[in-house]
Structures are given as structure tokens and as C-alpha cells.
Swiss-Prot record:
GO cellular component: cytosol
UniProt superkingdom: Bacteria
UniProt keywords, alphabetically: Iron
Family annotation (PANTHER family): FE(2+)-TRAFFICKING PROTEIN-RELATED
Iron recorded as keyword: yes
Species classification: Bacteria, Pseudomonadati, Pseudomonadota, Gammaproteobacteria, Alteromonadales
One example GO MF annotation: iron ion binding
Name of the protein in its database record: Probable Fe(2+)-trafficking protein
GO biological process, one term: cellular response to oxidative stress
């Protein structure tokens, strides 16, 4: 049976992550409070941030920026702003 967490992002009970994906205290906080669904949403935003901002994960400043964005997105309810990105509209 999958473990559930009270997801701070989705604001509901949801399936939790299978294991701690991020190191340290922040990783523990994510494991305890973020669902698989919310983590998947973050991963798509993270990919967009890396690509659009040409972030280098070997660069400490770029990793710190990405971590700050992750905290804002998952725990503070702030959406990720990607300069120049316009979401595709559904044609109805």
C-alpha cells in the first residue's frame, strides 16, 4: 500500500513519494509534506526553468536559484515565472 501525505502544495491527502529524492533537511521536508503529483508538477517547472534560463547544474548559484524556486513553488504557493514563456491555449 502506498504511503500518503498531507500535501502542502495540493492542500489534500495524496500519495507520497516512494523515497527521499532531495538531500538534507529540505529533502526530509519534501518527503514528509509533498505528494508524487506535486513533485511531478515541480519537475516540469524545473525543466522549463533550467532550459529557458540556460541554468548549469554544475554552477552553485544556478543550483541555489533553482532550490529557492522549488521552495517558493512547493511550500509558499508561488508560481514559477519563466520570462518569455506563454502557455499554450486550448482551442475550444
Amino acid at each position: 500500500m502506498a504511503r500518503t501525505v498531507n500535501c502542502v502544495y495540493l492542500k489534500k491527502e495524496a500519495e507520497g513519494l516512494g523515497f527521499q529524492l532531495y538531500p538534507g533537511d529540505l529533502g526530509k521536508r519534501i518527503f514528509d509534506n509533498v505528494s508524487k503529483e506535486a513533485w511531478a508538477l515541480w519537475q516540469s517547472k524545473q525543466t522549463m526553468l533550467i532550459n529557458e534560463n540556460k541554468l548549469n547544474m554544475m554552477n552553485v548559484d544556478d543550483r541555489k536559484f533553482l532550490e529557492e524556486q522549488m521552495i517558493n513553488f512547493l511550500f509558499e504557493g508561488k508560481d514559477v515565472e519563466i520570462e518569455g514563456y506563454v502557455p499554450q491555449k486550448d482551442d475550444e
